[in-house]
Amino acid sequence: MTERLAPGSVIGILGGGQLGRMLSVAAARLGYRCHIYDPAPAPPAGDVAHAVTTAAWEDATALAAFAAAVDAITLEFENVPAAALDVLEPLRPV
């Protein structure tokens, strides 16, 4: 992705742990909203994010809906399954 996201854009974050929480807070200060995708109920980042999707990494339907709700996607941690990224990459910049 080479274009900058305009303020107000939604950043999708794969993983809702402490790093996702800190990223959400920093993004909000810059005028962005964050949407978390995490299989765990009530992830730490969920308290500060604009939206949360709770679904399995293998749920292609939930991943596609998540991609449709965000403008770009980033990873909170390095162990996101490659199959999940394979679903997301054709839909949004990762």
Residue ranges and their predicted role:
Residues M1-V94:
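ATP-binding N-terminal substructure of ATP-dependent carboxylate-amine bond-forming enzymes
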